[in-house]
């Protein structure tokens, strides 16, 4: 009985360690249609604490970059896409903190390109101190089933998204605009 109990405790401890391996967790991503056709991307983040050996304080994570990648089908028969990317930096988060990050597509772009509220593909990359965290399932669309497709999507968004550079905007660039 003791061996069985020890096995269960070890299994639970390993499971908990695997769940908390990333310092910043992407909990949820939502897309919302706003006034005047603006589109909002909401990313909910949680801080799990600093796993770095030489961390100044294990309860604080610093220099967090959040990069959003969106892909909308432009022409299905030609398999062409419009890509939008943008990133922000969060200075610091404390263990247990939840933070929401917002990105926006202007209504005139959404209207002109007839974009749906939810993109065909999306991914949110989180980096801490310049090091990208492992991809998290909650950080990507269900159309991205494996790392090969994810890497291809990121590569294409980076190389083919120049036409839409700065179109997807972080929340601090749309302050003062009444989005309802």
PLM features: what roles do these ranges have?
Residues 4-14:
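Sec-dependent N-terminal signal peptides
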Residues 18-20:
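Boundary at the C-terminal end of the N-terminal hydrophobic targeting segment
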Residues 24-34:
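Short amphipathic beta-strand and strand-loop transition segments with alternating hydrophobic
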Residues 32-54, 59-65, 103:
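Contiguous beta-strand segments within globular domains
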Residues 44-47, 101-115:
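Short, hydrophobic beta-strand segments
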Residues 52-54, 109-121:
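Short glycine/proline/serine/threonine-rich loop/turn segments at secondary-structure transition edges
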Residues 56-89, 120-129:
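Extended low-complexity, serine/threonine- and proline-enriched intrinsically disordered segments
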Residues 84-94, 107, 123-180:
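Short beta-strand elements
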């Amino acid at each position: 009985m003791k061996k069985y109990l020890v096995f269960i405790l070890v299994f639970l401890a390993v499971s908990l360690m695997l769940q908390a391996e990333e310092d910043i967790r992407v909990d949820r991503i939502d897309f919302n249609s706003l006034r005047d056709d603006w589109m909002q991307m909401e990313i909910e983040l949680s801080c799990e604490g600093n796993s770095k050996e030489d961390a100044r304080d294990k309860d604080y994570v610093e220099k967090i970059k959040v990069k959003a990648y969106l892909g909308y089908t432009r022409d299905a028969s030609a398999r062409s896409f419009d890509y939008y990317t943008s990133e922000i930096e969060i200075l610091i988060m404390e263990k247990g903190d939840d933070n929401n990050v917002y990105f926006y597509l202007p209504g005139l772009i959404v209207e002109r390109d007839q974009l749906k509220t939810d993109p065909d593909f999306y991914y949110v990359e989180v980096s801490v101190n310049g090091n990208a965290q492992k991809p998290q399932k909650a950080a990507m669309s269900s159309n991205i089933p494996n790392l090969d497709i994810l890497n291809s999507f990121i590569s294409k968004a980076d190389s083919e998204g120049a036409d839409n550079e700065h179109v997807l905007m972080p929340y601090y660039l749309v302050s003062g605009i009444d989005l309802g």
